[in-house]
Amino acid sequence: VDPRNFKNYRKGMLDVALAGVITNLIVAFVCSFVLALLGDWIFSYSASAAVYYLKYFLFYLLGYSVLLNINFALFNILPLFPLDGFRVIEAFSKRDNGFLRFMRRYSGTILLALILLGFVSDSFFGIDLSPVTLYITHVGGWITSALKWLWGLLGLNLPL
């Protein structure tokens, strides 16, 4: 994205930053709806091998599309440069901000340290203690539960 093309820099950067996250959530929403519509059919008995593999393929395609798009949205909204979350904070902050300078310079190191913390804690303690993993797992679980609840109101079963 070339910010020089924006008439209003802050609004343009905010729109671009939120577009990716919102698109991920919309794709997850639509795929979860299709999966919920097909849920009972996917788990019904199939005498034909072709139908069985079609159901298998659709279940994994739609299920992973839901989960991956939720995870992508949650990862992209982290306030680390150059992710979308940083751009959102940048749009609402003053231009010469110490936090923004710090994050531009050290975000890569911070993200690497957070991910390595997960690998080290998993290797030594058998538990992934990475804040990024915990955040995505918990908040992603809440979003998935909300989708299950929503489709349950319509009498649909979201098999995730």
What are these regions, as identified by a protein language model?
Residues 1-160:
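Hydrophobic transmembrane alpha-helices and their immediate loop junctions
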